[in-house]
């Protein structure tokens, strides 16, 4: 879990040798959902302050769509 997130299984990919971060989550179907990515170089704290709320909103939209489709 990323500190400050309401999503218990929100994780980040960290490609080796870069400051790029990709936030992802496994949805209730156990499908990996890549929510957003960005380069946090020089923005170590600000990156998460902006990225986590956006990732949470995107994930909620994804879950809403799954509910509308009857998938969950």
Regions found by a protein language model. Give the residues of each.
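Short, hydrophobic/aromatic-rich segments at coil-to-beta transitions
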Residues: 5-12
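Enriched for short, Lys/Arg-rich terminal
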Residues: 14, 18-72
């Amino acid at each position: 879990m990323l500190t400050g997130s309401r999503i218990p299984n929100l994780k980040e990919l960290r490609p080796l040798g870069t400051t790029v971060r990709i936030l992802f989550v496994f949805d209730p179907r156990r499908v990996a959902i890549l929510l957003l990515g960005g380069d946090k170089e020089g923005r170590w704290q600000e990156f998460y302050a902006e990225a986590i709320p956006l990732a949470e909103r995107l994930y909620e939209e994804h879950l809403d769509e799954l509910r509308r489709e009857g998938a969950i």
